Amino acid sequence: MTPLTGGRDGGNSYFPQYESTNMHTDAQGNVLTTESAEAAALFSQAITDFMDYRTTPSARLKEALEKDPDFALAACFRGCFLMMLENRKILPRVRETVDTLRKQANSLTRRERLHIDALGAWADLDILEACRTWEELLTIAPHDILAMKLHHTMAFYTGRSQVLRSVIEGALHAWDETVPGYSAVQGMYAYALEECGAYDEAEKWGRDAVASNPNDLWAIHAVGHVLDMQRRYEEGADWLNFSAEDWSDRNPFKAHLWWHCALFHLGMGDPDRALTMHDDLLRSINSDSYVDVSNQASLLKRLEMQGMDVSTRWELLADHSATRIDDHILTFRDAHFCLALAAAGRTETVRDQLASMVAFAKDNDGWTAEATASTLIPLCDGIVAYESGDYKATCDILWPMRNDLAPVGGSHTQRDLFRQILEDAAVKGNCTELARTLFSERLAQVPGDSMYQAKYVALSA
């Protein structure tokens, strides 16, 4: 898609350059091209709800567009929600939306045009270009919390931790507690700091965010990551001790926090509790959501590697994954679809998925295609080898790439599953020297980790 050109200058709150009677502002003061004050208010509330992971943003945007059908940024935001479904079937619809919005270019601000350009790149599966566009937008409108959150979300799926951090730091000069939404910025910054290894700073920013807004699931999540990386399992389980009723009005992301809580119980040596959480809080959410597939698949595999029998729980995940083998929207998602299929013994379907990945990487450009070729396909080859019991092949594939998995996306904690698979393969395949090296690396990174200390000692027994 061709980026927008022309249009009016200005259009951001930080350096306002003009005023117009057909404009209103969002909660942070960013100019909105709409004649409807009601539509502007609904748009602002949709952003707030989006930050809090509530189920209501789409409905608010629909209502805003009913108030003003020409409200370009509301339509763009709605397109972003469609993209977050991560379903290839919606791509033509989103691209049509982008084409329609570009016809309004001359009446929109530069900030709004950049939002549309970012959505266009995203719909073309060039996540990196979408992120670069949001980064440009934030240089002219650092108060644009929507752009910041969208960038944060998608940069997360490129595995570029330092980018998460630097982009927020570049906008921090415009933020303090007097600006609505500041706690959400604190929460995003906390997560970025954690992914960059600045755990003490991350915990402070995250706890400050939660103190200001106890509804901020991302800030709660950021602190949970710190507790996980520092092996503070009991604190983590207490921190994430929320019931289904507590989060009844939240979207499926809530299950990811329960996934973290289950990992804390697993770390505390209570796999039975972790499996119960899977059955009661994860499996019951929505298996059609790729987030829930990744949560469940990664937890089930961790449980299996600790000797738990998860019985037929793979089957539902494999059934869903089998319907999505040609999507290739996110490498992170495809990796977990592959895991679910391979763990359930769907050999032919996995072969079809891998062939589809190869064709996609060959026939397409952009970040997703490049990451599929460089990282996803060999990772999935390693997963398939592991599930087929060929542990030597698993080690041969995963050992050289163990420190280069970031392009798959996700967090350090999420990608750690693939290292655990390598470690388990090294033990089961009697690759003793390799296993000893892997466990030594673990203990150097987290001294005193009792589980890995026991594994290390067992190799010499």
Regions found by a protein language model. Give the residues of each.
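Inter-helical turn/loop elements of alpha-helical hairpins
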Residues: 37-40, 47-62, 66-70, 75-112, ...
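Residue-level recognition of tetratricopeptide repeat
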Residues: 38, 71-74, 110, 144-145, ...
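Structural register within alpha-helical repeat arrays
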Residues: 38, 45, 78, 117, ...
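Residue at a conserved register position within TPR or TPR-like alpha-solenoid repeats
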Residues: 49, 82, 121, 155, ...
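Short coil turns that delineate tetratricopeptide repeat
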Residues: 69, 106-108, 142-143, 176, ...
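Helix-coil-helix junctions within alpha-helical repeat/solenoid scaffolds
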Residues: 265-461
